[in-house]
């Protein structure tokens, strides 16, 4: 049986989002008066939920501070002026080929729908 639907992950599969995610976490921590986490520590957690990443990066932070970090991260991430992620070079040709072959295409992500929509709307409305 031939599959009809192909589901792709967004972060790290279609889009190269590592640098923007790291930069956004580091800025958020600084904005909340905390030492910015090391890039490698953040990179190792990409793919986990936002609350889980914050808990792992700031295990001693209280609930209020973790909520503030999450709100600050979301505000930075959703700011259209901070958009600078790119799709991997092979992503669009691959998606176009699969679409032409009649496959339904979808994106799954651990980020909220608002974040995904923003990423797509800013630069990739042709997808």
Task: Please name every model-derived segment.
Residues 2-44:
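Active-site neighborhood of HAD-like aspartate-dependent phosphohydrolases
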Residues 125-126:
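Conserved small/polar residues in nucleotide/adenosyl-binding loops
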Residues 55-93:
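Metal-dependent phosphoesterase signature
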Residues 79-107, 113-118:
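Short, acidic loop-to-helix structural element flanking the phosphoryl-transfer center
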Residues 28-29, 49-63, 119:
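Helix-loop "lid/cap" segments that line or gate small-molecule binding pockets
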Residues 22, 47, 51, 92, ...:
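Alpha-helix N-cap/helix-start and coil->helix boundary motif
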């Amino acid at each position: 049986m031939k599959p009809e639907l192909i589901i792709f992950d967004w972060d790290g599969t279609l889009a190269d989002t590592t640098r923007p995610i790291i930069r956004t976490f580091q800025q958020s921590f600084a904005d909340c008066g905390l030492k910015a986490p090391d890039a490698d520590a953040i990179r190792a957690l990409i793919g986990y939920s936002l609350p889980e990443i914050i808990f792992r990066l700031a295990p001693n932070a209280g609930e209020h501070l973790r909520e503030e970090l999450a709100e600050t991260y979301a505000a930075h991430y959703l700011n259209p002026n901070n958009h600078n992620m790119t799709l991997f070079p092979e992503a669009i040709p691959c998606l176009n080929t699969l679409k032409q072959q009649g496959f339904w295409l979808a994106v799954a992500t651990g980020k909220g729908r608002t974040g995904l929509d923003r990423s797509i709307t800013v630069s990739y409305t042709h997808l």
